[in-house]
From Swiss-Prot:
Family that this chain belongs to: Belongs to the LAMP family.
Gene symbol of the encoding locus: LAMP5
Organism of this sequence: Homo sapiens (Human)
Name listed for the protein in its UniProt record: Lysosome-associated membrane glycoprotein 5
GO biological process entries: establishment of protein localization to organelle; presynaptic modulation of chemical synaptic transmission
Taxonomic lineage of the native organism: Eukaryota, Metazoa, Chordata, Craniata, Vertebrata
Tissue expression: Expressed in plasmocytoid dendritic cells. Expressed in suprabasal skin keratinocytes and squamous cells (at protein level). Expressed in the brain and weakly in spleen and skin. Expressed in plasmocytoid dendritic cells.
Entry GO CC: cytoplasmic vesicle membrane; dendrite membrane; early endosome membrane; endoplasmic reticulum-Golgi intermediate compartment membrane; endosome membrane; GABA-ergic synapse; growth cone membrane; late endosome membrane
Key words of the record: Cell membrane, Cell projection, Cytoplasmic vesicle, Endosome, Glycoprotein, Membrane, Signal, Synapse, Transmembrane, Transmembrane helix
TM region positions: 236-256
Function: Plays a role in short-term synaptic plasticity in a subset of GABAergic neurons in the brain.
Cytoplasmic side: 257-280
Keyword Transmembrane helix: yes
Reported modifications of this chain: Glycosylated.
Miscellaneous remark of the record: Appears to be a novel specific biomarker for blastic plasmocytoid dendritic cells neoplasia.
Length: 280
């Protein structure tokens, strides 16, 4: 009985040691995160890099702005009116992140943590007619804001921290092994904990890859958003049509020139038979 009694605590101690070892391994493998926004030529765009074991595992370039509605008292101090705060993600933000095989995460904090953005990416495999196909997507966005912060909010009623979350989000869907690129603006609606308020997140100049980065600090092949592809087609279509029209004109002129030359070299046969004697 004594041996059995001693064996149970030993097993518990072993479990505790294993849990501590697992925790220490996670801490030692914790990724380093860099804010490289100063390298961007676009003052509104931020650049974030997450690295694990000296290798880039997540890269994100984008400009982000949040449209946040909030209530203030009307001049009669009886009615409420809704104002709007435009909050841009600024340079010099604090960044955290982690990479995983099927889940990656990016967190950004700015203005003394009055604002926080959390983006969760997932990689999934789907069974298609031609076989399994893997994609990644932005599956969740969370925005925490403090309406008592005076730079963007003016005399907000019930000022304090609020959390806005996406609902059943599936954005930036991209084939696995590729990066997502989109210069056009994209909007994502977030339901706020502030009653009956919806926060709008506006993304632009986006270039993101949260999985399968092969070269350090280098994006993989781009998967462009449909809006960019359509705009690119609209830009190149007039050029293509112009080239086709120019080619048609050149071919027409060449045919005319050849026809004219062949016609000029032909012997003109007189219609009047009396003129045959003058030939030869």
């Amino acid at each position: 009985m004594d041996l059995q009694g001693r064996g149970v605590p030993s097993i518990d101690r072993l479990r505790v040691l294993l849990m501590l070892f697992h925790t220490m391994a996670q801490i030692m493998a914790e990724q380093e995160v860099e804010n490289l926004s100063g390298l961007s030529t676009n003052p509104e765009k931020d650049i974030f890099v997450v690295r694990e074991n000296g290798t880039t595992c997540l890269m994100a370039e984008f400009a982000a702005k949040f449209i946040v509605p909030y209530d203030v008292w009307a001049s009669n101090y009886v009615d409420l009116i809704t104002e709007q705060a435009d909050i841009a993600l600024t340079r010099g933000a604090e960044v955290k992140g982690r990479c995983g095989h099927s889940q990656s995460e990016l967190q950004v904090f700015w203005v003394d943590r009055a604002y926080a953005l959390k983006m969760l990416f997932v990689k999934e495999s789907h069974n298609m007619s031609k076989g399994p196909e893997a994609t990644w997507r932005l599956s969740k966005v969370q925005f925490v804001y403090d309406s008592s912060e005076k730079t963007h909010f003016k005399d907000a009623v019930s000022a304090g921290k609020h959390t806005a979350n996406s609902h059943h989000l599936s954005a930036l869907v991209t084939p696995a092994g590729k990066s997502y690129e989109c210069q056009a603006q994209q909007t994502i609606s977030l339901a706020s904990s502030d009653p009956q308020k919806t926060v709008t997140m506006i993304l632009s100049a986006v270039h993101i890859q949260p999985f399968d980065i092969i070269s350090d600090f280098v994006f993989s092949e781009e998967h462009k958003c449909p809006v960019d592809e359509r705009e690119q087609l609209e830009e190149t279509l007039p050029l293509i049509l112009g080239l086709i029209l120019g080619l048609v004109i050149m071919v027409t002129l060449a045919i005319y020139h050849v026809h004219h030359k062949m016609t000029a070299n032909q012997v003109q046969i007189p219609r009047d038979r009396s003129q045959y004697k003058h030939m030869g």
